[in-house]
From Swiss-Prot:
The keyword Disulfide bond applies. The modification Phosphoserine is found at residue 18. It holds the Pfam family Myosin_tail_1. Expressed in all larval and adult muscle tissues. Expression is five times higher in tubular than in fibrillar muscles. Its main location: cytoplasm. Belongs to the paramyosin family. InterPro entries: Myosin_tail, XRCC4-like_C. It is found in: Cytoplasm, Myofibril. This is Paramyosin, long form. One of its GO terms (biological process) is regulation of actin cytoskeleton organization. Heterodimer of two isoforms. Residues 1-31, 859-879 are annotated as: Nonhelical region. Keywords: Coiled coil, Cytoplasm, Disulfide bond, Motor protein, Muscle protein, Myosin, Phosphoprotein, Thick filament.
Length: 879
């Protein structure tokens, strides 16, 4: 509880009469601090509070005594009931001994508390005596200070009286000075009236000059307006000239551009003409070729009508192709003709534009000449206006000089008038200041007299209070002696009470130490568990990190290998595709050659059937067919070798596919292991969260306990305040016969304060433990968040690896599709080759049959371009 302090102020006024003209009143304020009385009142209230608390404690002890007596009776009954069991009797005896020991300790605690209360009362009594002595010393010091202040105030009063006399003398001197200044003011007023008359004359003359000046300024403004119009017309003419020049330059540029475009168009026309000529020549060549082809066609038609019937479709296709090509060429020629016509139109249009531009140029040149003439005339007019303006400016400057001189005279007169007015104002201000000073000095003298009177009154009051304090001091000494006697009486009771209180304190200390040991053991166990959990988490996290890093490195290695194999496979596929395209082209050539040979062979058969004279040509065709066959065989061998290469490549692809599938299975197993480890880590994380929740619940329980203690403390404070209010009402009745109870209550309060301090220490320790636990919880949460982040990163890496694996699977499937396509193509080529071989075999068999029927001898010369002589012998077999 906070002690309230009261301040009492006493005022004394002294009135003194001096030999001077005025009286002085002096006021002295003296403040006395009554903190000692307030302290005593607070102590009395505290003692009353302790009395009530001690009464409550006594009632509680009596209740406990009654409860214990009831328990003793119950225990005796139980002992009578359980006489048969020796062990039960021993336990009951032990419990009874323990309860008796507790009661003895309580009695010892009461004795100790009483001794402590007596010591406290002695200390309080000594403190009260010292406080009274200090108050007496303070009062004596205050009295000495008051006497010193009185002497100072008297000296100040004498000084003020001397100042008043000096002020009166200065007042007489200032009144004389004021009369002199009034005479000078009247003279200055006469001068001011004369100056006003001269100012009126000067102002009339100034108005005349201003009117003349206004007229001259109007003339100057008119001339300026004319000049502005002339300059504006000049600027317009110059701008028109510049526009004309710009137009001329633009026209020149356009003309040059048009000439360059014309030149380009002519070049393009020449190139188009050359193209037309080339196209016409190509058309003529094509027509010649067509004529030749038509002639060949007619000759072939005349020769082999039967062949035309057989190959009518091929001829129609060739005709269609030629017709399509002819139509394309005709369309191209028509487009070229259209381009030529467009270019000729452009040329004519550009020529017309050039003519129009030439006409515009001539017009602009004529307008330029006219504008130059008008500019020359304007410049002449401008020179005349400038000469007039110079004359008017000279007149204006002379008039301004005269006006400035007159204005300077007027300013001087006005300045003198202002000085006179300022002097007058200063004199009036000084007069007012002197009057105000006189009034203030009179007021200060009256205030000093009043303060002297107040100081005398305060001195009288202080003397009366001194007498009262001496009487109170005597009464306090008598009360002190009585209280000392009472304190000696209470000392014995207090010693007994203190002895009992010490015993109780020892028991409570033992209980507190046991509780502290238990709490410290629990805290150490919790810390050990937290440390073990942290170490386990850290080891598991490091192990998982290491495993995942190893797996990531393995995955990266496998990815690099897969990328390399993919690149190699892509290169092989590209090579194979190029080889396949080459094979296809070569095979198409072979097919064409085979078709040509077959066509030739069919023609030979028809000729042999129809014409025996064409056997030599058939033989030549046979030779060519043999050659083609050899080439085909060679190509077949090459194709077979390429097919073997493709099969080996396909086998390698299949092996690579199997390897990739194995790697995929390994990656899948790794993925399953990682997912299992992730599940294990999630379970551990959940366990850690459960432990954290348990720790948080414990923290909340501790906080609730602290809140309960604070509420109990607040309720106790409220009860103490209420009791203090009640005790203030019953102060006088409770102080008389309650010293012994007060001593016991003070001892009890000390015990409660000690318990409070111990509770505060426990509270501080629990808060420290809570903070440590909160730190550990935060660290665990941070580690959990880091683990979650690592898990997220690992999941991202796994997703990326799965995506890459899917990409590899797609690439593998695409490669498989490509390999299947290549195998189908190879099989198709093999089938076509087998069909060609069958055809060649049939042709050979038919040729052998023909040879058997007809024998031909071919004689050829080695000279190129020589004729072939065929000697044919027919043999008919008749049976």
């Amino acid at each position: 509880m906070s002690s309230s302090q009261a301040v009492r102020s006493s005022k004394y006024s002294y009135r003194a009469t001096s030999t001077g003209p005025g009286t002085a009143d002096v006021n002295i304020e003296y403040i006395q601090d009554l903190s000692s009385l307030s302290r005593l009142e607070d102590k009395i209230r505290l003692l009353q509070d302790d009395l009530e608390v001690e009464r409550e404690l006594r009632q509680r002890i009596e209740r406990e005594k009654a409860d214990l007596s009831v328990q003793v009776i119950q225990m005796s009954e139980r002992l009578e009931e359980a006489e048969g069991g020796a062990e039960h009797q021993f336990e009951a005896n032990r419990k009874r001994d323990a309860e008796l020991l507790k009661l003895r300790k309580l009695l010892e605690d009461v004795h100790l508390e009483s001794e402590e209360t007596t010591l406290l009362l002695k200390k309080k009594h000594n403190e009260i005596i010292t406080d009274f002595q200090e108050q007496v010393e303070i009062l004596t010091k205050n009295k000495a200070r008051a006497e010193k202040d009185k002497a100072k105030f008297q000296t100040e009063v004498y000084e003020l009286l001397s100042q008043i006399e000096s002020y009166n003398k200065e007042k007489i001197v200032s009144e004389k000075h004021i009369s002199k200044l009034e005479v000078s003011i009247s003279e200055l007023n006469v001068k001011i009236e004369e100056l006003n008359r001269t100012v009126i004359d000067i102002s009339s003359h100034r108005s005349r000059l201003s009117q003349e000046n206004i007229e001259l300024t109007k003339d100057v403004q008119d001339l300026k307006v004319q000049l502005d119009t002339v300059s504006f017309s000049k600027s317009q003419v110059i701008s028109q000239l510049e526009d004309a020049r710009r137009r001329l330059e633009d026209e020149d540029r356009r003309r040059s551009l048009l000439e360059s475009s014309l030149h380009q168009v002519e070049i393009e026309l020449d190139s188009v003409r050359n193209q037309l000529e080339e196209e016409s020549e190509a058309r003529i060549d094509l027509e010649r070729q067509l004529v030749k082809a038509n002639a060949d066609a007619t000759s072939w038609q005349n020769k082999w009508n039967s062949e035309v019937a057989a190959r009518a479709e091929e001829v129609e296709e060739i005709r269609r192709k030629y017709q399509v090509r002819i139509t394309e060429l005709e369309e191209h020629i028509e487009s070229l003709i259209v381009k030529v016509n467009n270019l000729e139109k452009m040329k004519t249009r550009l020529a017309s534009e050039v003519e129009v531009l030439i006409i515009d140029l001539e017009k602009s040149n004529n307008s330029c000449r006219e504008l130059t003439k008008s500019v020359n005339t304007l410049e002449k007019h401008n020179v005349e206006l400038k000469s007039r303006l110079d004359e008017t400016i000279i007149l204006y400057e002379t008039s301004q000089r005269d006006l400035k001189n007159k204005h300077a005279d007027l300013v001087r007169t006005v300045h003198e008038l202002d000085k006179v007015k300022d002097n007058n104002n200063q004199l009036t201000r000084e007069n007012k200041k002197l009057g105000d000073d006189l009034h203030e000095a009179k007021g200060a003298i009256n205030e000093l007299n009043r303060r002297l009177h107040e100081l005398e009154l305060e001195l009288r009051r202080l003397e009366n209070e001194r007498d009262e304090l001496t009487a109170a001091y005597k009464e306090a000494e008598a009360g002190r002696k009585a209280e000392e006697q009472r304190g000696q009486r209470l000392a014995a009771d207090f010693n007994q009470y203190r002895h009992d209180a010490e015993r109780r304190l020892a028991e409570k200390d033992e209980e507190i130490e046991a509780i502290r040991k238990q709490t410290s053991i629990e805290i150490e166990q919790l810390n050990a568990r937290v440390i073990e959990a942290e170490t386990r988490l850290k080891t598991e996290v490091t192990r998982i990190k290491k495993k995942l890093q190893i797996q990531i490195t393995e995955l990266e290695m496998s990815l690099d290998v897969a990328n390399k194999t993919n690149i190699d496979l892509q290169k092989v596929i590209k090579k194979q595709s190029l080889q396949l395209t080459e094979l296809q082209a070569h095979y198409e050539d072979v097919q064409r050659q085979l078709q040509a040979t077959l066509d030739q062979y069919a023609v030979a058969q028809r000729r042999l059937a129809g014409l025996n004279g064409e056997l030599e040509e058939v033989r030549s065709h046979l030779d060519s067919a043999n050659r083609a066959k050899r080439t085909v065989e060679l190509q077949y061998e090459e194709a077979a070798s390429r097919i073997n290469e493709l099969t080996t490549a396909n086998v390698s692809l299949v092996s690579i596919k199997s390897k990739l599938e194995q790697e995929l299975s390994v990656v899948a197993s790794d993925y399953e292991e990682v997912s299992k480890e992730l599940r294990i880590s999630d379970e551990r994380y959940q366990k850690v969260q459960v432990e954290l929740k348990h720790v948080v619940e414990q923290v909340h329980e501790e906080q609730e306990r602290i809140v309960k203690l604070e509420t109990i403390k607040k309720s106790l404070e409220v009860e103490v305040k209420n009791l203090s209010i009640r005790l203030e009402e019953v102060e006088l009745n409770a102080v008389a016969g309650s010293k012994r109870i007060i001593s016991k209550l003070e001892a009890r309060i000390r015990d409660l304060e000690l318990e409070l301090e111990e509770e505060k220490r426990r509270h501080a320790e629990t808060i420290k433990i809570l903070r440590k636990k909160e730190r550990t919880v935060k660290e665990v949460l941070v580690q959990c968040e880091e683990d979650q982040k690592n898990l997220i990163l690992l999941q991202d890496a796994l997703d990326k690896s799965t995506a890459k694996i899917n990409i590899y699977r797609r690439q593998l499937s695409e490669q498989e599709g490509v390999s299947q396509q290549t195998t189908t193509r190879v099989r198709r080529f093999q089938r076509e080759l087998e069909a060609a071989e069958d055809r060649a075999d049939t042709a050979e068999s038919s040729l052998n049959i023909i040879r058997a029927k007809h024998r031909t001898f071919v004689t050829t010369s080695t000279v190129p371009g020589s004729q072939v002589y065929i000697q044919e012998t027919t043999r008919t077999i008749t049976e």
